[in-house]
């Protein structure tokens, strides 16, 4: 599966693969007068990773200085993803995030930042008309903006928001022997991923890897029980938790193309693979039967 020549450094990386999926996304720039308000808007609007339950999910790509934004204010770039090509549902879900998490924050604006678009969404229908017919349009840095009048004047959003196609659900597990490694190594990983333009980690440090098979189908994906350390003795031979492993956090990555996803996986694993408290690195998959793509961990680590 992996490369024939495996670097000694990657001896603790399992020769396995992760599955990833096609998805549509939009890449937005949110600006605000105040840094705390900006952070609240960007983090609130990306807080719930809902793709596995048929909702939208997002993540923060990075922050932008005032001199690099269209309105010369503090900015942050976020991605919002949907795992279906139901554009009407995507538009509605996106509007909820914008209306309930951004529009309601004082002095915020939203600009399109999607490169290589496949199409666009008219934001008047589900966001602009929050102005109840009193909304209007104006230019900001040669961009067509909808102005929604609010009690703290005013919210602005670019009229056309582009969307494109990318890769979602790339993942790996870093199996830890010590509790502190879960967060310590996880922070290092997330910081490394943030250095790669075009990718997000929608769950941050994820403590609950899931599986498709379930005893309760109305819930959706449930806990991946063979990889729960607390069930190792109870499951006996069914358990897949390696000896010495007490915690199995997961990192999920969405990216605008294969190149940036692979770079993010590589730099993330490289950032922690030498830690003594990380026993093994592996990945989640569905035997190659569910995702649109299969990516070998060792191929990525040896080729990028």
Name each model feature, range by range.
Residues 2-69, 80, 87, 92-250, ...:
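Conserved mixed alpha/beta catalytic, RNA-binding, or beta-rich assembly cores of soluble enzyme
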């Amino acid at each position: 599966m992996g490369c024939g020549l495996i670097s000694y450094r990657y001896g603790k990386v399992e020769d396995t693969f992760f599955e990833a999926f096609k998805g549509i996304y939009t890449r937005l720039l949110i600006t605000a007068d105040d840094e705390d308000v900006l952070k609240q808007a960007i983090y609130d609007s990306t807080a719930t990773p809902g793709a596995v339950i048929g909702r939208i999910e997002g993540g923060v790509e990075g922050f932008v200085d005032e001199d690099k934004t269209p309105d010369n204010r503090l900015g942050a770039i976020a991605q919002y993803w949907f795992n279906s090509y139901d554009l009407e549902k995507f538009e509605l879900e996106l509007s909820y995030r914008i209306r309930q998490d951004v529009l309601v924050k004082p002095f915020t604006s939203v600009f399109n930042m999607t490169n290589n678009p496949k199409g666009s969404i008219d934001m008047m229908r589900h966001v602009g008309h929050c102005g109840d017919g009193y909304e209007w349009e104006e230019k900001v840095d040669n961009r067509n903006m909808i102005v929604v009048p609010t009690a703290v004047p005013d919210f602005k959003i670019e009229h056309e928001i582009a969307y494109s196609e990318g890769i979602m659900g790339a993942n790996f597990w870093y199996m830890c022997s010590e509790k502190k490694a879960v967060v310590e190594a996880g922070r290092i990983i997330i910081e490394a991923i943030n250095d790669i333009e075009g990718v997000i980690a929608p769950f941050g440090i994820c403590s609950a890897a899931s599986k498709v098979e379930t005893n309760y189908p109305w819930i959706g994906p449930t806990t991946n029980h063979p990889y729960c350390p607390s069930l190792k003795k109870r499951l006996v031979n069914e358990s897949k938790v390696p000896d010495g492993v007490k915690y199995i956090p997961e990192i999920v990555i969405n990216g605008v193309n294969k190149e940036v996803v692979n770079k993010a996986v590589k730099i993330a694993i490289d950032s922690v693979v030498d830690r003594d408290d990380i026993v093994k690195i592996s990945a989640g998959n569905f035997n190659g039967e569910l995702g649109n793509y299969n990516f070998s961990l060792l191929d990525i680590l040896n080729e990028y």
